[in-house]
């Protein structure tokens, strides 16, 4: 169960990383075409790197290089970056290997193809010449794997853990995208566009709002939209549902602290009064939600909740030092 949770979570993390890097790279090209000089490039990458949680000295070193490819290489391939795309795919693949009997041959095949794509791209100049094409391939493979998870394995307890990992990661990343939106400046059309595209929300947002690009509307949609698959509210409701599917507890009750905390988050999101909220109030809402999700993530595999068997060794970036195989 632990391995399935992290398998799904790492795939979701890679897709979100690729989308954020892709939209930021496109924005940097647009800025450089209109404003000559390196400062334009620095100004757009620094809040992104901060948002991704990299150490300040690493960020300073990357910005000082004044080279977008150095930043992208760090995000994509660096062995010093535990959350690089390459490391996340290696960890997803290793988690899949440990539960090989619980996933389909199609999932295993595409994970191997993904792993080989990343390995071959590491030393290939093509990705530097066309990062957009590289990120499109990464995003497409993540979406393919998500589809295979939904359509090629039993929808049993293991699948519920896969969905749990996906939705907790997705909710967290949407919150971080909104935090980045606040840091980058909400009133610039470029910032609004990249925020929606980073969350795969551009088309859905236009359909729901008929083209209103007010900052508070962006916050409200990505936080509270009840039927958009990447809104925080939707993800938390799904998280709550799948946790209850695992425990067998009725959805209107709870059997452990994880379900209690998840239910509380859902209640906050369901009953938040969006009509009387300005963007300042909505921004202040982000950090407490991130803290709540972090608490839930840490609680899921506590021994009194959904504990994994003691003999099962998880593979994730927070585990004790492990030798990464299949590099």
Residue locations for each model-derived region?
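Alpha-helical transmembrane segments and their helix-helix packing motifs
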Residues: 1-327
């Amino acid at each position: 169960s632990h391995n399935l949770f992290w398998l799904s979570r790492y795939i979701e993390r890679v897709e979100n990383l690729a989308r954020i890097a892709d939209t930021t790279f496109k924005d940097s090209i647009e800025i450089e075409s209109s404003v000559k000089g390196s400062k334009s490039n620095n100004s757009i990458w620094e809040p992104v790197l901060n948002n991704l949680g990299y150490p300040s000295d690493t960020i300073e070193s990357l910005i000082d290089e004044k080279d977008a490819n150095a930043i992208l290489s760090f995000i994509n391939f660096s062995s010093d970056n535990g959350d690089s795309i390459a490391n996340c795919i290696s960890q997803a693949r290793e988690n899949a290997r440990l539960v090989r009997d619980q996933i389909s041959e199609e999932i295993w095949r595409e994970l191997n193809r993904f792993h080989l794509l990343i390995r071959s791209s590491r030393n290939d100049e093509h990705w530097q010449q066309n990062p957009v094409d590289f990120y499109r391939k990464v995003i497409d493979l993540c979406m393919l794997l998500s589809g295979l998870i939904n359509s090629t394995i039993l929808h049993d307890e293991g699948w519920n853990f896969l969905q749990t990992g996906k939705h907790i990661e997705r909710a967290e990343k949407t919150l971080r995208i909104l935090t980045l939106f606040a840091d980058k400046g909400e009133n610039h059309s470029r910032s609004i566009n990249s925020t929606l595209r980073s969350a795969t929300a551009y088309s859905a947002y236009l359909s729901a709002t008929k083209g209103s690009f007010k900052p508070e509307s962006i916050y409200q949609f990505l936080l509270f939209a009840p039927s958009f698959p990447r809104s925080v509210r939707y993800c938390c409701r799904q998280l709550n549902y799948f946790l209850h599917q695992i425990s067998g507890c009725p959805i209107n009750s709870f059997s452990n602290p994880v379900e209690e905390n998840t239910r509380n988050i859902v209640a906050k999101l369901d009953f938040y009064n969006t009509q009387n909220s300005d963007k300042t109030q909505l921004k202040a809402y982000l950090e407490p939600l991130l803290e709540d999700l972090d608490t839930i993530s840490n609680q899921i595999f506590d021994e009194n909740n959904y504990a994994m068997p003691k003999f099962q060794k998880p593979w994730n970036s927070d585990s004790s030092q492990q030798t990464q195989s299949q590099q």
